[in-house]
Amino acid sequence: MTKLKLLALGVLIATSAGVAHAEGKFSLGAGVGVVEHPYKDYDTDVYPVPVINYEGDNFWFRGLGGGYYLWNDATDKLSITAYWSPLYFKAKDSGDHQMRHLDDRKSTMMAGLSYAHFTQYGYLRTTLAGDTLDNSNGIVWDMAWLYRYTNGGLTVTPGIGVQWNSENQNEYYYGVSRKESARSGLRGYNPNDSWSPYLELSASYNFLGDWSVYGTARYTRLSDEVTDSPMVDKSWTGLISTGITYKF
């Protein structure tokens, strides 16, 4: 278990939870997360997860992602954002002999704009961000519609969304170069951009004043541009996490 993997998962879980209306200025917690990777013969990861959330008038922070509000009111929230993208591939971690001869794919820092618009029927959440560390040089656009239901201490937020990956993003994480093909025996592959729909559900229950338990899950149906890669043997990816937090 590396610190990078643990913290990166924390970002993913914070992002998946879709916390746009914070219920407190600052909260700390811990939990456990399960991540299903799309790569061939790649084990499901189970990680402990730190939870650190802060919501202010000008700044917000969740996991290893944060932002500065350019506009912030009850209806609309626009911010400059940066976050650590947890997507990665380590050749030595694959159980497939051919996959072990591929190059590693690194996780990276993404930066861009995020926007949320709230109505009585739910809210729109969208983020457009690009790689800042010259790894993939890719762009990712995520857009979702969510509805928050609250009953006493229970809050449930289902959502449906779609993620667009640029050609560079898919090329880096799912493409197979000529050199890799010659080394591994896998066929070369050059994907285009893609759209992948997803469903997500998050829930929290407040008990004993400032203590809460939470759970979140996301199911992503991978596009053909991803599933056609010889690196991939699944049609979906998934995330489940649960834990406990304390609000200050």
From Swiss-Prot:
Its main location: membrane. Disulfide bonds: none annotated. Forms a trimeric complex with MrcB and MltA in vitro. It comes from the Bacteria. InterPro entries: MipA (IPR010583). One of its GO terms (biological process) is peptidoglycan biosynthetic process. Residues 1-22 form the signal peptide. May serve as a scaffold protein required for the formation of a complex with MrcB/PonB and MltA, this complex could play a role in enlargement and septation of the murein sacculus. Transmembrane segments: none annotated. One of its GO terms (cellular component) is cell outer membrane. Belongs to the MipA/OmpV family. It comes from Escherichia coli (strain K12). GO terms for molecular function: protein-macromolecule adaptor activity. This is MltA-interacting protein. It is found in: Cell outer membrane.
